[in-house]
Amino acid sequence: MNSKIIYSVLVAFFISIITGPILIPLLHKLKFGQNIREEGPKSHQKKAGTPTMGGIIFILATIISMFILIKNPSDEAMFAMYAFIAFGVIGFIDDYLKIARKNNLGLKAKQKMVLLLIVSFAFAYYGANNPEIGTSIIIPFSEKTLDFGIFYIPFIILYFAATTNAVNLTDGLDGLATSITILVMTFFVIVSFNMGHYTLSVFCAVTAGALLGFLKYNAFPAQIFMGDTGSLALGGAVAAVAMILKLPLVVIIVGGIYVLETLSVIIQVISFKLTGKRVFKMSPLHHHFELCGWHETKVVSVFSIVTVILCMIAFLSFK
């Protein structure tokens, strides 16, 4: 693999490491602390006041690294970075409103979904009308592609909305979403490089490197949370990269933890509405394992191991 990929990881890592000690005290000073849901695990109540919006750290590290390393980024790399930033902005607005209102209620669900759908439409429309991306996607474990035609735009809109929300739901334990997304982005570094998308592989590498640096401050016990600023940005980046590579279906495999977290919430809600009973002790899934007696670090470790296995399976899907 090109040595530039290694440099990309290292540059972003060190920028993220340097940014942390600057931003964390600033957020403390501004009293940008996380409000913890009362209905969440009792062990999480002590986390109240931990600075949020930490996604700013790895977003800045990624942007700065890209402009340091690549003088003329390709359209596809810029597309991924625009998605990264655009969804991050929605998350930032949500985080800011939560802090301003001093509760865990930021944007209303409908407001947030409308913003996500509008931004998703913009990227879906661009992709459908870009000959380098087109309206077809690769079917895993086969040499075939599926052309969505006129259904491509609605499919991609739902795909972006689902991916961003899934990463957002996964961000419930110290270092969980960070660790999982480092592995997912590492997978896409290798795949995009092997498919000839070199500048896109650099984007994936700097994102992974920036997250590695951020993990120093986000791992248990977290000094800062990424907030919706970070989780929505990461969801947008993962969705955009996979869309460019025509691999939205592969995200279901490598992002299996994202999928399970989301399904656990859906199953919990449907079960409670239909039967009045809960399938899980608490959703999303990571909280269920917490209430089963698992420590946060064990949940993160096991989910990360599962993601490594899923990435290996995803590699086998390429013929």
Swiss-Prot record:
Its EC number is 2.7.8.13. One of its GO terms (cellular component) is plasma membrane. Keywords: Cell cycle, Cell division, Cell membrane, Cell shape, Cell wall biogenesis/degradation, Magnesium, Membrane, Metal-binding, Peptidoglycan synthesis, Transferase, Transmembrane, Transmembrane helix. Its cofactor is Mg(2+). The keyword Transmembrane applies. It is found in: Cell membrane. GO terms for molecular function: metal ion binding; phospho-N-acetylmuramoyl-pentapeptide-transferase activity; UDP-N-acetylmuramoyl-L-alanyl-D-glutamyl-meso-2,6-diaminopimelyl-D-alanyl-D-alanine:undecaprenyl-phosphate transferase activity. The chain crosses the membrane at residues 5-25, 50-70, 77-97, 113-133, 148-168, 173-193, 195-215, 224-244, 247-267, 298-318. One of its GO terms (biological process) is cell division. It comes from the Bacteria. Pathway: Cell wall biogenesis; peptidoglycan biosynthesis. It is a multi-pass membrane protein. Belongs to the glycosyltransferase 4 family. MraY subfamily. Catalyzes the initial step of the lipid cycle reactions in the biosynthesis of the cell wall peptidoglycan: transfers peptidoglycan precursor phospho-MurNAc-pentapeptide from UDP-MurNAc-pentapeptide onto the lipid carrier undecaprenyl phosphate, yielding undecaprenyl-pyrophosphoryl-MurNAc-pentapeptide, known as lipid I. This is Phospho-N-acetylmuramoyl-pentapeptide-transferase. It comes from Clostridium tetani (strain Massachusetts / E88). The gene is mraY.
